[in-house]
Amino acid sequence: FKQDVVDLMPTVVVILAGTNDIAGNTGPSNVKMITDNIFSMATIATANDIQVVLSSVLPVYKYEWSPEIVDPPSTIDAVNECLKEYAESNGLYYLDYFSKMVDNRKGLKKEFTPDGVHPNEKGYELMSGIAEKKLMSILDF
């Protein structure tokens, strides 16, 4: 985080993290571990006068490569709720991709993904529009 963000001295950082942890890509994890890691990044950024935008974890119904991961939507909901509360309590910004991209199963809408996890071009277009609007308001453009 130091070399990727702090050393570059940005005005704002958008943090979108957590899905790889939820999927088990980095080993076993839980909501507290995931959110503590994200909160640590936010604390480091804030200490370096970088405004922080915490982004919701994108919806995922199932990680096909990790069938042992049970009920990702519940974990994602819990992480997102913690992120939103933390942002509100600490004067940070919260960027809600989730509500614009979720389907009725609490997965990523098919129109936004090739595999149920990663956004496609249309998904990234939606996300960039949401992020741009938030950043413009933060930076007074």
Regions from the PLM with identified roles:
Residues F1-F141:
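Alpha-helical cap/lid subdomain in secreted, periplasmic
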